[in-house]
Amino acid sequence: MKNFFYKGNKKIQQRMLNYGMEWAATHGKVRTFICCYTLGGTASLKLYQKAYQNEKFMIMALCSYLGNIQINNPWESLNPYTMVQNKEKFLPLKFSEETQYFYI
């Protein structure tokens, strides 16, 4: 599957970020702080695997998931609660117990 990224499309980036922040804010007490270089479009399994090794890909994959526009999502059961329970799997994202946010 071809991956594509909306590096130049600010409208789509903003829409995804707004949707992602709204989704994170309305799903329980755990909030997800998103800071990214670019927002991903579709995300393949290979991209998600790269996410574990490169924080840029991690943030793109997370934004893509929260934006809910990706195809064949291998993390379809992912939600902020499971992210907290399995924080070590989401490194290099740092989880703050005090603020309940994930940070780069």
From Swiss-Prot:
Top-rank taxon, per record: Viruses
Functional summary from the UniProt entry: Plays a role in virus cell tropism, and may be required for efficient virus replication in macrophages.
Family affiliation: Belongs to the asfivirus MGF 300 family.
Protein name: Protein MGF 300-3L
Species this protein is from: African swine fever virus (isolate Tick/Malawi/Lil 20-1/1983) (ASFV)
Source species taxonomy: Viruses, Varidnaviria, Bamfordvirae, Nucleocytoviricota, Pokkesviricetes
